[in-house]
């Protein structure tokens, strides 16, 4: 008896523990991801997201324009907000992003796939770096996250909330783009309730 090799546990018993461990790791990951996305703008890489794709495409086309980037300039801000609000069907208040170093250039009306119409507000900093805010009516559930067009292209921080689909797009470092998006989001929500 003492000279014999120890008996091995049945294969099903060792596989059960492996399966239980894998399930536990999966649950921790899912729960952690859920909790992280509840109250902040998190990161999601979802190539099927139309809102982010449309916002990035519009930004790439119009942010590069010098003379024809907007239809209505910032000097007509009240008209711009009223016009875009009426056309998109949402109350739209252009966020003041001066604290983040960006001034409103103006805005334009764009087509937006299933949503119909979207507003695009264009902002610029002192160095000429441009970001855009893309806003459309959205009936989807609340989602917050980011979407990246390509490794070296513009990135969109987007959210769907209170009937609004919004994306802030730019080629800024991720932390700065998220800070701008949070400020824009807060001001849009404040504008909705005023």
Label for each model-derived stretch:
Residues 80, 129, 176:
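Short phosphate-engaging motifs
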Residues 15-20, 28-118:
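Juxtamembrane extracytoplasmic segments of single-/few-pass membrane proteins
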Residues 140-194:
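A short, solvent-exposed beta-edge/loop patch
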Residues 97, 108-111, 121-123, 148-149, ...:
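Short acidic-hydrophobic surface loop/beta-edge motif
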Residues 2-22:
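Membrane-interface anchoring determinants
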Residues 117-138:
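A short acidic-to-branched-hydrophobic micro-motif
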Residues 100, 117-119, 129, 155, ...:
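Envelope-exposed proteins and targeting segments
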